[in-house]
């Protein structure tokens, strides 16, 4: 199995875990920061221009409940970059939760509610 296939499979399992834990929410995968954050200043927009978040949970009114990041081994050594990404999302008013492994349904419910 290639590294790409392994990472994709890991994300796919997380998607279905989120769907199982939160059937009342819409789960979006691979959402561009530009769909979540707006700014007319080009310099500021350039900071998040090509960034993508793993999962966004939306309620029935399409309000963002939580942003979920699933950090695979490629994130090792990128803690500062991840913290900066999280800070951008927090500053925009979003809650962010990071996992290094696919959590149990109970953990997800505890963390996200």
List PLM regions with ranges.
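Solvent-exposed, charged helical/coil patches
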Residues: 1-41
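Conserved catalytic cores of phosphodiester-cleaving nucleases, focusing on short active-site segments
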Residues: 18, 55-57, 66-70, 89
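Active-site metal-binding core of divalent-cation-utilizing nuclease and nuclease-like domains
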Residues: 29-63
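Active-site-adjacent loop/helix micro-motif of nuclease/hydrolase catalytic cores
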Residues: 48, 75-82
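Arginine/glycine-rich "motif VI" loop of SF2 helicases in the C-terminal RecA-like domain
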Residues: 60, 87-95
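Short coil/turn motifs at secondary-structure junctions
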Residues: 60, 73-75
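Acidic beta-strand-to-loop metal/phosphate-binding motif
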Residues: 67-71, 97-100
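Basic, glycine-rich
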Residues: 93-113
């Amino acid at each position: 199995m290639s590294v790409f296939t392994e990472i994709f499979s890991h994300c796919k399992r997380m998607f279905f875990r989120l769907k199982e834990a939160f059937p009342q929410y819409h789960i979006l995968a691979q959402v561009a920061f530009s769909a979540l954050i707006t700014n007319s200043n080009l310099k500021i927009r350039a900071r998040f221009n090509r960034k993508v978040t793993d999962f966004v949970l939306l309620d029935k009114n399409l309000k963002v409940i939580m942003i979920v990041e699933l950090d695979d081994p490629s994130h090792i050594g990128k803690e500062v970059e991840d913290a900066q990404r999280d800070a951008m999302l927090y500053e925009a008013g979003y809650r962010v939760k990071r996992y290094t492994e696919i959590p149990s349904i109970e953990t997800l419910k505890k963390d996200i509610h």
